[in-house]
Amino acid sequence: MIKIRRGLDLPITGSPRQSIEDGPAIRSVALIGFDYHGMKPTMNVQVGDKVKLGQVLFTDKKTVGVKYTSPAAGTVSAINRGERRVLQSVVIDIEGDEAESFKTFSEAEIASADRQALVDNLVDSGLWTALRTRPYSKVPQLDSVPNSIFVTAMDTNPLAADPQLVIGEKSAAFALGLAVLAKLTEGKVFVCHADGASVPTSAAANVEAKAFSGVHPAGNAGTHIHFLDPVSANKTVWTIGYQDVIAYGELFTSGKLPVDRVVSLAGPQVTDPRVVRTRLGASLQELTAGQLKDGENRIISGSVFSGRKTSSPTAYLGRFHNQVSVLLEGRDRPFLHYLVAGANRFSVMPIYLSKLFGGKKFDFTTSTLGSERAMVPVGAYEKVMPLDILPTQLLRSIIVGDTEAAQQLGCLELDEEDLALCSFVCPGKYEYGPILRDNLTRIEKEG
């Protein structure tokens, strides 16, 4: 068991009730382009086309042969593009239940099948896109083989659902999904779970369970990779979420693309925080309708630390998100706020009176209580960075765009979520996730 001691469990109100309930009916879903870094689509459909569940919507020029399939049967109602015609979303109004069929395999057939047969089934169904590489967090090339695969079967994000609720319901499908993953690599398949959790495993010899405990980011894939099989410019691993492992198992037994998604609907502005069963790419306006407190609310697909702020073209559940968080927009500017005692304010530094009340939770808003300013090294980053890197030096290097120094300091190990806590505690109010992504894009492009 690996214990994470440096990090932060955010004391935020609105934690979800840990039992799965059915969510509201969803009438529209979308596939979000921003979920796939560097993707350049070649469209197979246009607005007004009827599509089946699992039908190809587009392919990717950058990862030849990879297919992106429809998360529902219905009509393509919008193809939204932004600047430079970057794909924002493909929206589908749900209608009917027509679905594409894919090959089925028994557990014995999976064990004896060659790797290419399993890859072909994942590609045809669109579930190949559930895999992400590290470094760069991109959909892997079809001819690539990872050094190992990491299954994230725990979640330490604020307001997250307990993965054991979901895995416990579909343990057989989870185990079968692990058997599929075991055939995709000659290395280990690490199933990373919370200490004390009961997680099904596979009979495959290369599947290995690893327990983690401690504060967030103990549940991040980047943390698991750092301690178990660190990556480099010449060494790649893949990551996948626990609900996608279940989807792998269901695909190979049913021959139909699974689209169920269990998410937490939580946060200070949710009237009844709970865990709901919905579907992949669900409209967040429909999912949260009648569920929010009064006020100007920000709906976030994902964690409050590293999720995506939703706007009209992209107000849908992200491909890799297992939660929907809602915060009040922080428009107020209190007079001389820096002079208050701070009984109702939170800081990782001992500057507020609230530090004396250890168990108190706070109604966080989107306010940063200040504008962007110079980066000040006061030891805040070191308090929340559990990885064996120098966070202050790394953050400075990516701010100035020194990619050579950033690589030497370990940026290739990281994804946006791995620097989310650094953004939260930053006295300079920097958002390090987008800065890291810009640097990773340059490194990959320049070699």
UniProtKB/Swiss-Prot annotation:
It comes from the Bacteria. GO terms for biological process: sodium ion transport. Transmembrane segments: none annotated. It catalyses: a ubiquinone + n Na(+)(in) + NADH + H(+) = a ubiquinol + n Na(+)(out) + NAD(+). The keyword Translocase applies. NQR complex catalyzes the reduction of ubiquinone-1 to ubiquinol by two successive reactions, coupled with the transport of Na(+) ions from the cytoplasm to the periplasm. NqrA to NqrE are probably involved in the second step, the conversion of ubisemiquinone to ubiquinol. Belongs to the NqrA family. HAMAP family: NqrA. This is Na(+)-translocating NADH-quinone reductase subunit A. It comes from Saccharophagus degradans (strain 2-40 / ATCC 43961 / DSM 17024). The gene is nqrA.
